[in-house]
């Protein structure tokens, strides 16, 4: 049995199951005209959040599996320069990249050869378990912001 149950729980958490809305539902049906709006009181648009999530998730994934990875400069390297996507193609490209990286993190977690508890050799004490939880937590936080913005803009259920 080992850590099979823990891996299943992590995969569910990364997938947004349970108490969370999954990322696909969070980003589905957002008209292009709303993607770059910063509602009153919100510091970011949906596009900025999507890109921030993509960039941060990629950084965490690459840190987890690549000793030569260099993280972006904090904080500016983790946020897009534009408030809105330049076009629909870039929006779709960002979502596709987000999905691929999330899938790669899930694959890393699901692989029984991945030691979830071992310290990442090039880190400062981090483990794959910690990095997977960080991805899930970070995504859940910002997906909540996306849904809040969608509510304010009248674009949520």
Task: Map each language-model feature to its residues.
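Short, contiguous alpha-helical
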Residues: 3-20, 24-27, 32-80, 120-157
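Acidic/histidine-rich alpha-helical segments that form the ligand environment
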Residues: 82-119, 130-135
């Amino acid at each position: 049995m080992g850590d099979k149950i823990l891996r299943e729980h992590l995969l569910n958490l990364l997938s947004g199951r349970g108490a969370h809305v999954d990322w696909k539902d969070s980003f589905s049906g957002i008209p292009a005209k709303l993607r770059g709006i910063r509602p009153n009181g919100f510091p970011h648009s949906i596009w900025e959040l999507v890109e921030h999530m993509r960039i941060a998730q990629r950084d965490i994934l690459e840190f987890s599996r690549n000793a030569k990875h260099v993280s972006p400069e904090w904080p500016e390297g983790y946020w897009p320069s534009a408030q809105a996507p330049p076009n629909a193609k870039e929006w779709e490209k960002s979502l596709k990249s987000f999905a691929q990286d999330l899938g790669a993190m899930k694959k890393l977690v699901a692989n029984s050869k991945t030691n979830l508890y071992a310290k990442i050799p090039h880190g400062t004490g981090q483990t794959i378990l910690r990095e997977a939880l960080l991805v899930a937590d970070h995504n859940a936080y910002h997906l909540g912001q996306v849904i809040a913005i969608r509510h304010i803009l009248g674009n949520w259920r």
